[in-house]
Amino acid sequence: MLRPLPAFATTTSLVVVVLFLAASAAVQAGDEADAGGGGVVGVDGTRFVVDGGRTIYFSGFNAYWLMLMASDPARRGKVTAAFRQAAAHGLNLARTWAFSDGGDRPLQSSPGVYDEAMFQGLDFVIAEARRHGVYLLLCLTNNFHDFGGKRQYIRWARDAGHRDLAADDDFFNSTVVKGYYKNHVKTVLTRVNTFTGVAYKDDPTIFGWELMNEPRCDADPTGAMVQAWVEEMAPYVKSIDGEHLVTAGLEGFYGDGAHESKDLNPWGIYYGTNFIATHRAAGVDFATIHLYPDVWLWGSGAGEQLAFFKNWTQSHVEDTERYLGKPLLVTEYGKFLWEGVANRTQRNYFLGMVLDSIYDSAAAGGPLVGGAFWQLLDDGMDTLRDGYEIILPEDRRAASIISSHSRQLAELNGQDVEALRRRRSRRANRKIHVDGSGRGRSSSHTPQFKILLLRFIAFFRSVSSLFSGV
């Protein structure tokens, strides 16, 4: 017959249990903190915050191709290499596609029909980002026809009998098409990762959701159509995932609304968006701009492009602070790399200017607190070169500029840069175990948990034995 332990033993056992649970939670929390640098990212005024209020700044990159590459297990090494290089250079944010609408390599081949191999590719991307301490900004569709986008949604609707839809911009006001888009949003956000077992909407690796890459609307230059669409879709995303941040995906073009600095638009043209009004919409947590002076001002001289860069950046920083009170990210920036050393020097000069503007704002407490260059590639990916690529191992000067900027932002974060680098390196060395189906699980905190459990059992037995003869 078992006898009850004395009160002291019971209390001691309870304390042990509490300590054990606390230690287990600490291990889990440590893993979540490493997932991207500090758990789920939130917003406090013009700051991004983690860990209950610590400010975080972002040194990032674009790599739209991650899911596509990872959908083929034989090519997943390129994804791992990209994250490894990013982490080694202090990058902590990656912007990539969570869509591929129709076409030859679709994620969504038709409305509501998904390719599991492609989805597992996205699963792998998220798992690898987590392993290397990189946050992800996931974009949900495209304004342009690359990888489907608006045009593919319209084609699906027309194929279903909705022949009244003729233009790509009908995407923004068609009830049918908006239903297709919402279904995609729900499918992606509620997806359970086959490598981590965590639903996307619950994964702290994900920094946020971008409604569309570079929304534009020629059919309505005033911006009203895009505005209404964002006002509907941002709250819809929030209704499924109330934890992660949401942004519209704008390039920063001004419209015809109040406080819009429309004279700053390239060539003074309207693009059907309103930088200020759209970023004021409910459910939109932060503002974005893109920066391509050599493309937007094609044929202009270096001096004119430099003046545009300064005015564009400064205007958006001031307007974000004055009218939005939200953080601002440059989610794309780049300069086309022509052949020759001279142009590479110009590209690196542009890179330094953008990064300096980000740092100057962040260091002064301004709203511009991060950016992501277009685009990161690995060696041997020549077919994806677009003239904007940065391959860190082969461009030492660009790599040095990026690393220096990342270090500066990490120091603003109040982080020990070398300790952060070592922690990310240790985490990256943890393997993802893949079973015969191609699915996997990260080793994560399992070893630490087992050690804690064994220690708990041993200690509990030793405490119990002290009173076994009472």
Which residues are covered by each model-predicted region?
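Long, low-complexity, intrinsically disordered segments
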Residues: F449-V470
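Basic polycationic patches enriched in arginine
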Residues: R3, R426-R430, R439-R441, R455, ...
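Classical eukaryotic N-terminal signal peptides for Sec-dependent ER targeting/secretion
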Residues: M1-V16
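C-terminal GPI-anchoring signal of eukaryotic secretory precursors
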Residues: S437-Q448
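A recurrent domain-boundary module in secreted/ectodomain proteins
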Residues: E394-G436, F459
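Compositionally biased, low-complexity segments
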Residues: A9, F20, R439, A458-S464
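N-terminal signal peptide
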Residues: V18-G36
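Active-site mouth of glycoside hydrolases
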Residues: E32-P327, Y333-I358, A362-P393, R397-I401, ...
